[in-house]
Amino acid sequence: MEADMKLAVVTGQIVCTVRHQGLAHDKLLMVEMIDAQGNPDGQCAVAIDSIGAGTGEWVLLVSGSSARQAHRSELSPVDLCVIGIVDEVVAGGKVVFHK
């Protein structure tokens, strides 16, 4: 996955009772990448979430070193992080998503 911002929809939660200490207090989400119209691209991933996104919500993600910085720790084994819950997407002058 490239190190840029991505759109995704939250498809579920991951529960891990035993995990790396750098991930101890954050929720893990299953996400599916989408394009600007909300069409899934078939790529699913696990993202760390410290802002409270829920199933069905559109989220903004960062990956790589940007994800570690967003997660507040360069030492955490984080590669994908939720950095925003999307309220609206406008593409080509049309509202394609509104919460």
Curated annotation (Swiss-Prot):
Occurrences of domain BMV (ranges): 5-87
Induction summary: Part of the 17-gene eut operon transcribed from a single promoter, induced by ethanolamine and adenosylcobalamin (AdoCbl, vitamin B12).
GO biological process: ethanolamine catabolic process; generation of precursor metabolites and energy
CDD domains: EutN_CcmL
Pfam family, one: EutN_CcmL
Pathway this chain belongs to: Amine and polyamine degradation; ethanolamine degradation
GO terms under cellular component: bacterial microcompartment
Keywords for the protein's UniProt record, in alphabetical order: Bacterial microcompartment, Virulence
Domain of life assignment: Bacteria
Protein location: Bacterial microcompartment
Broad class of the protein's primary localization: other
InterPro entries for this protein: EutN_CcmL (IPR004992), EutN_CcmL_sf (IPR036677)
Record note on biotechnological use: Artificial BMCs can be made in E.coli by expressing eutK, eutL, eutM, eutN, eutS (eutSMNLK) or eutS alone. Cargo proteins can be targeted to them and beta-galactosidase (lacZ) was active within the BMC, showing the BMC allows passage of substrate into the interior. This can lead to the development of tailored BMCs for specific metabolic reactions. The addition of eutQ to the eutSMNLK construct results in biogenesis of multiple BMCs.
Keyword set includes Ribonucleoprotein: no
Phenotype caused by lack of the gene: A double eutM-eutN strain grows as well as wild-type on ethanolamine (EA) and cyanocobalamin, but a quadruple eutL-eutK-eutM-eutN strain does not grow. A non-polar deletion mutant grows on EA at pH 5.5 to pH 7.0 but not at pH 8.0 or pH 8.5, releases increased amounts of acetaldehyde on EA plus vitamin B12. Preventing acetaldehyde vapor loss allow growth up to pH 8.5.
Family recorded in the similarity comment: Belongs to the CcmL/EutN family.
Subunit structure: Homopentamer with a small central pore.
Protein function: Probably forms vertices in the bacterial microcompartment (BMC) shell dedicated to ethanolamine degradation. Expression of eutK, eutL, eutM, eutN, eutS (eutSMNLK) in E.coli leads to formation of a single BMC. Coexpression of eutQ with eutSMNLK permits E.coli to make cells with more than one mobile BMC, as is usual in vivo. It may be involved in transporting positively charged molecules into and out of the BMC.
Note: The need for a bacterial microcompartment in EA metabolism can be bypassed by increasing the levels of EAL and an acetaldehyde dehydrogenase (not necessarily EutE).
Protein name, UniProt field: Bacterial microcompartment shell vertex protein EutN
Species this chain originates from: Salmonella typhimurium (strain LT2 / SGSC1412 / ATCC 700720)
Gene behind this protein: eutN
